[in-house]
Amino acid sequence: MVDAARASKLADRIQRIVAEMLERRIKDPRLGFVTVTDARLTNDLRDATVYYTVFGSDAEKAATAAALESAKGLIRSEVGRRTGLRHTPTITFVIDEVPDNARHIEELLAKAKQADAEVARAAANARPAGDPDPYREPRPADDDDEDDEDE
C-alpha cells in the first residue's frame, strides 16, 4: 500500500495527463466539450477513476463516453509512460453528476426562497385570529362568591 498523499498527487497528475491528451492528441470527432473534473486513484495504485463533464445533449454525452472508451488504451499507455509507475493503473471514465446535482439544489433553493417570500407577504397583512391580546385579564371577584364562603 502507498500512503494517501502519494496516491492523491498521482491522481492529480493523471487528471492533468488525461486532460492534456483529450485537448491535444485525441482527435475523435465524437468528443464534445469535455472537461476532466477529477481523478481518483486507489491506494494500491491499480485503479484510476477519471470524472468528466460534457456540455451538450444526452446523445452527445453518449458519443463522448464511447469516444473515451475507444481511446482508453492510448490514454492508459500515455499515463504509464509519463507517471513512471511499475504497474499502469486501469482507467475508468465516469460522468460527473456534480453539475446536475448543483443545478437541482439551486432550483430547490429558488423554490424555497419564493415560498418564503409568499409567506412573508401573507404574514405582513395578517391579523391574529382571536383577540389582539391573547392573555386574559383576571375576572373581577363577585360579591356573591364571598358570601357563599362565609356560610
Curated annotation (Swiss-Prot):
One of its GO terms (cellular component) is cytosol. The keyword Iron does not apply. Gene3D superfamilies: 3.30.300.20. GO terms for molecular function: ribosomal small subunit binding. InterPro entries: KH_dom-like_a/b, RbfA, RbfA_dom_sf, Ribosome-bd_factorA_CS. Its main location: cytoplasm. Keywords: Cytoplasm, Ribosome biogenesis. GO terms for biological process: maturation of SSU-rRNA. Residues 120-129 have a biased composition (Low complexity). One of several proteins that assist in the late maturation steps of the functional core of the 30S ribosomal subunit. Associates with free 30S ribosomal subunits (but not with 30S subunits that are part of 70S ribosomes or polysomes). Required for efficient processing of 16S rRNA. May interact with the 5'-terminal helix region of 16S rRNA. Monomer. Binds 30S ribosomal subunits, but not 50S ribosomal subunits or 70S ribosomes. Belongs to the RbfA family. HAMAP family: RbfA. This is Ribosome-binding factor A.
